[in-house]
């Protein structure tokens, strides 16, 4: 799915696989994944150990005062898509901080919003410190699913072209059924579901950044039927394309 806010997920226990845009990450204890607004993502959980996690969500505007304090470039760099493996010696610190944010989020009193803002600033500073001063904190993508990531990347970069399951199977020299099954297993998305989500993501951008007609945008994003585009857009975004364009709060 896609949403209009930042998601930071920290894994306390268990394992999961996160697919973001066109990359697959395997997360385990102490891993933190950053998902910016508009990124296509889905998580699947596996293993015998129950998954326990913190999920922190916040909107871009909540970062304004933090940007004014430590600089736009630093904040933007620290919140790019990716996974940080928090060193074991620092896990107590971040887990205590996340528990404090959870406590304040339950609305203790009129000071809670200020405590949440201060906690968010502390979390970002902690992440920046880990990124800049710790070795090997960045987690690489899952190499076991390299082929499915290549297929997802191709779709992500060529969404405006005609793309079918048969075409992709031929291009990557695998059977249609194998591609369909493995893609779903690796990403959590069905092949067509992912393709449509990528196209809608780009349609959203064009609706807000251009004055192209909705019909033109549909064709620019790979849809060959503007009615189908409208139906798909409403199904994924919960709003018609023309209303989305008029109402940026719906993003």
Q: Which residues make up each language-model segment?
A:
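Short acidic-glycine-tyrosine-enriched beta hairpin
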Residues: 22-36
């Amino acid at each position: 799915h896609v949403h209009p806010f930042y998601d930071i997920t920290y894994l306390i226990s268990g394992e999961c696989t996160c697919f973001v845009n066109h990359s697959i990450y395997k997360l385990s204890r102490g891993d933190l994944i950053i998902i910016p607004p508009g990124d296509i993502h889905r998580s699947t959980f596996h293993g015998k150990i129950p998954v326990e996690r913190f999920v922190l969500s916040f909107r871009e505007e909540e970062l304004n005062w933090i940007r004014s304090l430590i600089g736009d470039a630093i904040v933007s760099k620290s919140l790019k898509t990716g996974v940080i493996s928090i060193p074991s010696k620092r896990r107590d610190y971040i887990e205590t901080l996340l528990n404090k944010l959870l406590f304040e989020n339950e609305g203790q009193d009129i000071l809670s919003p200020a405590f949440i803002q201060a906690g968010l600033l502390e979390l970002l500073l902690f992440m920046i410190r880990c990124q800049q001063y710790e070795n090997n904190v960045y987690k690489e993508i899952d190499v076991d699913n390299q082929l499915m990531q290549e297929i997802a990347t191709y779709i992500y970069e060529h969404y405006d072209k005609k793309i079918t399951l048969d075409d992709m199977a031929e291009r990557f020299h695998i059977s249609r059924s194998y591609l369909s099954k493995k893609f779903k297993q690796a990403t959590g998305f069905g092949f067509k579901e992912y393709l449509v989500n990528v196209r809608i993501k780009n349609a959203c951008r064009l609706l807000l950044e251009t004055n192209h007609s909705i019909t033109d945008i549909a064709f620019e994003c790979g849809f060959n039927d503007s009615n189908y585009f409208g139906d798909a857009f409403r199904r994924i975004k919960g709003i018609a394309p023309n209303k989305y364009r008029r109402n940026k709060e719906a993003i």
